[in-house]
Amino acid sequence: MAKVRVHELAKELGITSKDAVTKLQELGEFVRSASSTIEAPVVKKLRDAYPGAGAAKAAAPAAAPKAPAASRPAAPAPGPAAPKAPAPAPAAPAPAAPAAAAPAAAAPAAPAPAAPAAPAASTPVSAKPGARPAPKAETPAPARQGGQAPRPGGPRPGNNPFATSQGMPRGRGGDGDRPPRPGNNPFAPSQGMPRGERRNDGERPGGPRPAAGAGGPRPAAGTGGPRPGAPRPGAPRPGAPRPAGGPGAGNRPTPGMMPNRTERPAPGGAGRPGGAGRPGGGPGRPGGAPGAGTGGGAPAGGGFGKGGRGRGGTQGAFGKGGAGRGKQRKSKRAKRQELEQMSAPSLGGVSVPRGDGETIIRLRRGSSITDFAEKIDANPASLVTVLFHLGEMATATQSLDEDTFGLLGAELGYKLQVVSPEDEERELLDQFDINIQDELDAEGDDVLEARAPVVTVMGHVDHGKTRLLDAIRNSNVVAGEHGGITQHIGAYQISHVHEGKARDITFIDTPGHEAFTAMRARGAKVTDIAILVVAADDGVMPQTVEALNHAQAANVPIVVAVNKIDKEGANPDKVKGQLTEYGLVPEEYGGDTMFVEVSARQNLNIDELIDAVLLTADAALDLRANPDKDARGIAIEANLDKGRGAVATVLVQSGTLAVGDTIVAGTAHGRVRAMFDENGEALDVALPSRPVQVLGLSNVPRAGDTFLVTPDERTARQIAEKREAADRNAALAKRRKRISLEDFDQAVAEGKIDTLNLILKGDVSGAVEALEDALLKIDVGDDDVQLRVIHRGVGAITQNDVNLATVDNAIIIGFNVKPAERVAELADREGVDMRFYSVIYAAIDDIEMALKGMLKPEYEEVQLGTAEVREVFRSSKFGNIAGSIVRTGIIRRNSKARVSRDGKVIGDNLTVETLKRFKDDATEVRTDFECGIGLGSFNDINEGDIIETFEMREKPRS
């Protein structure tokens, strides 16, 4: 026995395939889909789960063989019809008349338009209630039986794949609520199911069917067809009062509305209507009704010319009535699909949703086309195609920059906004119910306590910032800086007695070299007060102005320290005058900026400078913070210590940081294992405004990353991972090289673009960041060469760095770090170039020279000599030979040449293929010597022409 599929069994039981699959899964059977096959025991188990459905199904087939058409009427005998008679009470008057007189009875009962049109034959057929009388039921019964046999006229109901699914459902509709029989046209506009249901509802009992059959199987089918049924809601056709007009098919205008189908005309009541030829088919073919009453049905339907056509398009019957239109009419589904396709804009052969030009789409940095597609509910592949037609090439998962998204958004009518890093960080923390700003706003005065001011020392390189801090701290940091310039951010806290009270002050030292712009900006961001150091002998310099702009942008009060007043040529008044141009007016000039003249070398006026800082803090700032909460702050600097691992210098801005707290700083996370102050002494807690070194992080955070204490390690890890993914995507988008379609073929042909790959390793993260920014700003004036930093990190050069450099053919730059001995041997063996620097500008100069060396050589034309043609010799073997005399320079064989005549070039980019002195071959011929010159296939040579030879020489790059 063949295995049964789930959907076949579902049809047999009268349930949906989905219900069957669900039920089987509930019963513990593994079923993947409705097309799965199941064994006999499983079939039995499902049948047992639906005993009622199985019984109903069994009963239906039993009744079907007797009379498919009659089964619908449900009352071939008067007995069954009697109980149903009360339901169609309104139709009772019409059926009371005998079959022959049915037309007369139908006329008064049926609607005005239908009554006159209904013929005698159609009357008994269409009237459901009218068919109920026992005598009528008996009369139609034989007709139906006879009709079943002669059904050769057309395919069985339901077998026609082009039918609109009326045939089969109608034949069985009277049996009970059963799904449409197999064979329904899946492309029909969904009339099949409703029809079957209508026959089963109360308004179309099976009783009337027999009566209808009496008049003729086909008419009965037509009349009893689910389509014209009275229950049809919203159908403004005469078919609505069906009960009364049952006896006469003419009462059913639906058939009349059916479209013309010349292939099956049914004249009079002969073929379909009158003849019992289609009893069973009647139900499935509403069109049969009109045919039954040839003349009657058609006029009732609105008088279409070809009355009696048994079959008509279902939409003509149920939709807008009218003859000859159903054949071309499309289903609602098809129309809807066409409308959607028409409304969807197309670009490059794909349809994508468009905005109205004002729709704002927010994307994170480094988003891909897939992310954008999710926002606008589009197919990523379609957006890739659109971008391709706009001249940009990208994959669906490739991180794109803001310009590319702007181009795509403008084309599709969207305004794309790339979320700023600050907003991105805020949205990320919101996912973990952390909102730092709300925490600060919710704090009242009762929980705030005074904290130390954070002071940043800024200024131009070599103006004495670090020496000034040495004087304040009584230490000697300058001696430890390479090249005498600061390349790190240092943070220290001192205690100073001010007005008889000990006050703590936190100092942050920033680099002054131009490469450390990011560090200076970071220092201004975290500070309360800025000390602007200006050398009295140099005056205002570029980095002085930049530091001033950073401080003013951060809205930070500024105290000016005029340093080196002990030096010859010092002119503090000149400095004051210069700074006045930038909005810093000294108090003695009527302004509000405090100027203090100091000498860091001689320790002059250091206390006065500290007092000025504290006075400014007390007057202009509210320096308070809440120490009784989880710590929040910023990582000022970080490095990888060989013995202690990742070490981060953090500044606590609010709350209290304690040993054992779980923190996350940028992409690093971990538990605080130990804390140290600037002197290397261990601390247990760090209060607001306290800089400390933290041990225990998973990796080295970047300088400037915010840090916060989290409830548990899991939260810290998740925040760090999300930050890392966002940073990686942003870096990929930034690194992406945009190549237009116009340049793509050329780039491929030329081996694309020369790239210098670098791996940067440094001792602290801030220095590595500054070095990377400075290197990426190098411009050699040619887009054919680009610089790419494929990896950067903090700590010594490792074996993994060498392996990466080997694969990507990269150069390793070590900044204040060295490789281990084994790593150096591996690099030598693999041929990896490693460079080591301790001063940043030396690294910048070397990389710039390397980039210039990678540039494609530029060539210039250098003239070798000229020759005048005296005579032309014709040769069948070599072509025309120019007998010439060399006027200037040298004529060389295989050199490039051009021919000029009367000052006009007539042949260019030629080659001197043959060069002879008389009959001997020559390599070169000098001035005032005669020679024979052959230019290959170029034969347009006349006497008096000038042959000029030249070569292309490489032009040195400046």
Curated annotation (Swiss-Prot):
Q: Where is the tr-type G domain?
A: 450-621
What are the Basic residues biased-composition ranges? 326-335
Compositional bias segments (type: Pro residues): 75-95, 228-241
> Where are the residues of the annotated region G4?
563-566
Cellular component annotations (GO), alphabetically ordered: cytosol
Q: Where is this region: G1?
A: 459-466
Compositional bias ranges of the Basic and acidic residues kind:
195-206
| Record-stated family | Belongs to the TRAFAC class translation factor GTPase superfamily. Classic translation factor GTPase family. IF-2 subfamily.
User: What does the UniProt function comment say about this protein?
Assistant: One of the essential components for the initiation of protein synthesis. Protects formylmethionyl-tRNA from spontaneous hydrolysis and promotes its binding to the 30S ribosomal subunits. Also involved in the hydrolysis of GTP during the formation of the 70S ribosomal complex.
Designated name of the protein = Translation initiation factor IF-2
Task: Tell me what organism the protein belongs to.
Answer: Paenarthrobacter aurescens (strain TC1)
Provide the organism lineage as a comma list. Answer: Bacteria, Bacillati, Actinomycetota, Actinomycetes, Micrococcales
Which gene is the coding source of this polypeptide chain?
Answer: infB
